[in-house]
Amino acid sequence: MATMLTSDEAGKLLDFSQKLDINLLDKIVEVVYTAQGEQLRLAQSILTTLKEHPEAWTRVDSILEYSQNQRTKFYALQILEEVIKTRWKVLPRNQCEGIKKYVVSLIIKTSSDPIVMEQNKVYLNKLNMILVHILKREWPRNWETFISDIVGASKTNESLCMNNMVILKNLSEEVFDFSQGQITQTKAKHLKDTMCSEFSQIFTLCSFVLENSMNAALIHVTLETLLRFLNWIPLGYIFETQQIETLIFKFLSVPMFRNVTLKCLSEIAGLTAANYDENFATLFKDTMVQLEQIVGQNMNMNHVFKHGSDTEQELVLNLAMFLCTFLKEHGKLVEDAKYVDYLNQALMYLVMISEVEDVEVFKICLEYWNSLVEDLYNSEFFHPTLESTKRQQVYPRRRFYAPILSKVRFIMISRMAKPEEVLVVENENGEVVREFMKDTNSINLYKNMRETLVFLTHLDSVDTDRIMTLKLLNQVNGSEFSWKNLNTLCWAIGSISGAFCEEDEKRFLVTVIKDLLGLCEQKKGKDNKAIIASNIMYVVGQYPRFLRAHWKFLKTVVNKLFEFMHETHDGVQDMACDTFIKIAIKCRRYFVTIQPNEACTFIDEILTTMSSIICDLQPQQVHTFYEAVGYMISAQVDQVQQDVLIERYMQLPNQVWDDIISRASKNVDFLKNMTAVKQLGSILKTNVAACKALGHAYVIQLGRIYLDMLNVYKITSENIIQAIEVNGVNVNNQPLIKTMHVVKKETLNLISEWVSRSNDNQLVMDNFIPPLLDAILLDYQRCKVPSAREPKVLSAMAIIVHKLRQHITNEVPKIFDAVFECTLDMINKNFEDFPQHRLSFYELLQAVNAHCFKAFLNIPPAQFKLVFDSVVWAFKHTMRNVADMGLNILFKMLQNLDQHPGAAQSFYQTYFTDILMQIFSVVTDTSHTAGLPNHAIILAYMFSLVENRKITVNLGPIPDNMIFIQEYVASLLKSAFTHLSDNQVKVFVTGLFNLDENVQAFKEHLRDFLIQIREATGEDDSDLYLEEREAALAEEQSNKHQMQRNIPGMLNPHELPEDMQDE
């Protein structure tokens, strides 16, 4: 049984006046790994306190020498690692040298004997990383001979050489792969340049091992190390030496080296250098010759991957990676006649690998197929009207790839991933269910497969048609019928909408829709019908162009959707409503005009039978249905006819509304009836759906219910407040009170939706705003219970200010009187309470700042100070959306002041230095790293104001504002970060002025300064580059979207703007 740990006993460890008790430390470390409860907490607390002690590192050597416990030794290394990462620059030089020599001697001692090295693998890996951390701080300035030292030592002992390879590999990764954000840009560049300039010694060592060593483990680790070097070393070391030949002819055929060698070849294949084209082609040819010996012509890749060993599975993965990387980068080089057989062999391998039932392997292949078909589409631009056979003659590259691409088409259609719109799925138990959680990976895979299949269809639409028609026939005749086969086929059919020319699409879809409708009648059983229904709905929803051109099909499809709205199988009604609204948006005007051979418009039929259509739908589905019908009515251009349609359209909800209002006018307590309140909430949601679709035209319905709705709002508010006064705040959780809150929220939602869509600001201002402000502002202000205040009031006001702009400037003081101080009082105690009020409060502030800035200049100074303080409070939030909003408000405020010079000077005198102090406090706070781009924009603007003498008032006791701000900022930083040298601060402050006209450079300057601060405080810097990652992704997405718009069928029809769709 383990001995108990006492706090007195453990406290001895923290007494640095005594000799360290190694046995006691071992005991405490063991408690951490074996004990529970209070003993565990005590042990963890002691070890953490010891680790954080500034002198703890001085005990590391004793621990490593005398402890017999590997866990204790690892703990000691963590202490050492921490001091290197956080305090290296403040340690005396002799102590740095001592630590360096000590770590090197430990590594040599542990790695010189292969048996000892194997026994201490984890310990040694930690030592290696500690050495790399030292190198990042010492090399090359304080350790010029490091490369020659490590290379020289490697020649003395194979075991030592193995470990030195690991150190070099780790160093390469740290400098070239992970340096961003951990060391300053200048330091990173210096390390990279040094490593490149001294690489010849490392290369000689690697080559010597690979050519001469008989030690398999050493060869393997050398290949792993070389793999890390290949993406940055000077290209001459790869192409002007025997390196590639050694890899291909010496190691690729050896099973234990095969995978790492293929990885090396993939890394080389990913390089680009036009002057080495011949070398690349030779590399490909030689590798393919070797692969034929290894893989053969007819290996069943799927079987190997499914039933083979880990090594064999990895081979399939690495083979895919090599072929895809090479062909994507250099495929055109090997289209030459002398390499064409090798290219065909490579393509056949890729087709076989594409059939492997593993998503990650398939994604690798998909990326290449996508790049190939996109390149063929773009590089040999063609007329879509050209016959397929002629097309093959005109475009030789397409002719060459055609047989392979036919196989790829078949695979894409057979494996098509599930689109986001499909809600009915087969689960892992073989049951047909509604999908509730979106699978992001599946959606992304679908988008990539869809794009690839669209290109494939453009390249040969006849072949796509042939494969799909054959597969559909096999579904209908039952020879291949299964849920999976039908799903993948229909998902593929839906994915190529717009890729056929219109005539081909018509012929193809007539067959598809008829066959699917027939299949729905033919198959029995609810599960079968649910799967077939979901596929019909997905396919028809993807082809609005076809439906617009073929009225009979459009009517048949919509009637089929109405039929599905009565089908109670999970997910079918949802999909029916979702598909209906998509079709309504894209085909809206065809429903409001009389079509050939019809007695009336289809919208008339829908409105006449609406109650029977929606009788089996859930409330949320009814709202979707109403929104869909609203889009149809919005297409009616005759206002008189449109008003008549709206009246009929809203007849059902209005009947219930009128009944409730009538009964409430006789007895106001009726508005406490649960059924009535629930109905009111649902009716208001229906109105919101109608308003979204109708836009400004909804005004006729809004006018009908507006004043009654505001009265209901007031009474409901009174009822909530009374309930809270009698029963306490927890009454908010009772169903009736919750439903009352829904009524208030939906009232505000409805007003916000309509105002944001209205096209007559004066009409809104004159007729709707006065009663609205009287109703909701007074209610918000009077409510003494913060939790009962409706946050939607704030966001509604923000939307109204954003829409009406200068029209509402005169009302801003009234709005602020009602909501500003009472809300600020709710959110200024901490950063967490009332999150929705918090966000909406700043949305309102942002809207007023952007559109009614004069209102800020007209409020008393005391109230403006509250506004300013609330903005500062905003950007101190760790909630990123609130912090960003605060920074945006501040920057816009500074820009607005530029238009009001008199007010600006007074503002600068009062607030300028305060803003600097507050911004620097968040810039240097690690929880605000994501705000760095906005911090840089604001600070650069402020420093440019000072430098360009835009501030004429004195900011401090020194007449020259520039000198004063330099001294102020330097003093601010020096007092906050005492470990910084005067020179570091001086260089930083000088840069703030020198770079204030270049925001990007200014931001990099800030970032380097943050790295210097964190380097000495030991904090993680990896998040400093978050914005770059986000911006790069956003730019990539934008460019891709622009490209997709130019290729027919590439965008989902529902992503196209209206002017490109509803013709």
UniProtKB/Swiss-Prot annotation:
The keyword Repeat does not apply. It is found in: Nucleus; Nucleus membrane. Disruption phenotype: RNAi-mediated knockdown results in defects in nuclear export resulting in accumulation of RpS2 and pre-40S ribosome in the nucleus. During oogenesis, mislocalizes Nup358-containing granules to nurse cells and abolishes the formation of annulate lamellae. GO terms for molecular function: nuclear export signal receptor activity; small GTPase binding. Gene3D superfamilies: Leucine-rich Repeat Variant. Transmembrane segments: none annotated. PROSITE patterns: IMPORTIN_B_NT (PS50166). Residues 43-109 form the Importin N-terminal domain. Residues 1034-1063 are annotated as: Disordered. High expression observed in the developing embryonic brain, hind gut and posterior spiracles shortly before dorsal closure; and in the ventral nerve cord, midgut and somatic musculature shortly after dorsal closure. Expression increases when the tissue is well developed. GO terms for cellular component: cytoplasm; nuclear membrane; nuclear pore; nucleus. One of its GO terms (biological process) is protein transport. Interacts with Clbn (via its N-terminus). Associates with the nuclear pore complex via interaction with mbo and Nup214. Interacts with target proteins containing NES sequences such as actin and dl. Activity inhibited by leptomycin B, which disrupts interaction with the NES and RanGTP. PANTHER family: EXPORTIN 1/5, EXPORTIN-1. Receptor for the leucine-rich nuclear export signal (NES). Binds cooperatively to the NES on its target protein and to the small GTPase Ran in its active GTP-bound form. Involved in the export of dl, RpS2 and the pre-40S ribosome from the nucleus to the cytoplasm. Plays an important role in nuclear pore assembly by mediating nucleoporin condensation and biogenesis of annulate lamellae. Required for the function or maintenance of certain tissues such as brain and gut. This is Exportin-1. It comes from Drosophila melanogaster. The lineage of its organism: Eukaryota, Metazoa, Ecdysozoa, Arthropoda, Hexapoda. The gene is emb.
